[in-house]
Amino acid sequence: MTTTTETETTGPKHELAQVNIARLRFPLDSPQLKDFVDGLDPVNAVADAAEGFVWRLRSDSGNATDVPVFGDDWLIVNMSVWRDADALTGFMYAGQHRELLKRRREWFAHTREAMSALWWVPAGERPTVADAEERLLHLREHCLLYTS
C-alpha cells in the first residue's frame, strides 16, 4: 500500500516531511558521542541514495548538528522529506541507520515531550526549522504522550 497522494498526470501532490530532535547527553565533541558523530556521514550518504528520499536539512558542515532548534544548544535536529511513509520506514529500520538507532539511549536524554513529527508538504516544498518547531509545539500542546 502506498501512502503518498498523487494523480496519474501530475505525479505526487505531496511529500512526507519528518522532524526529530534529540537532547544530547554529552557535548558533540565528547568521547561518549564519537560513534554517533562518526556514523553521521555514512548514514546520511545511505539516506541520500535511498529509494524515495527527497531532501534533508543540512548546514555547511554537511549535516544538521549545528542547526539551532528551540534556541537550545543541547538539542540537535534531523529533518527530511520523503516520497511517502513506506520510503521513510524502509530507510529508518534498515542498515546503518538501524544500528545507530539501537544506541540512541547512550547518546540522547529521555524526554517526556514530543520530539518527532510527520506531516505532508506540497511536492517541492522544503520545510524550515520554524515549521518543525511549530509542529512539535502543536503536538506538545494537544497530544497526550505515553512514555515508559
Ranges and model annotations:
Residues 6-43:
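N-terminal "first-domain core" detector
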Residues 16, 30, 73, 137-140:
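Extended, composition-driven regions rather than compact fold-specific motifs
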Residues 18-22, 67-92:
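Short, well-ordered beta-strand segments in beta-rich or mixed alpha/beta enzyme
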Residues 30-58, 95-104:
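Short amphipathic alpha-helical segments
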Residues 51-75:
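Glycine-rich loop/turn
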Residues 72, 85-114:
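An amphipathic, aromatic/His-enriched active-site/gating alpha helix that lines ligand/cofactor pockets
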Residues 103-143:
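A contiguous, mid-protein "functional segment" used to position or interact
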Residues 146-147:
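Conserved small/polar residues in nucleotide/adenosyl-binding loops
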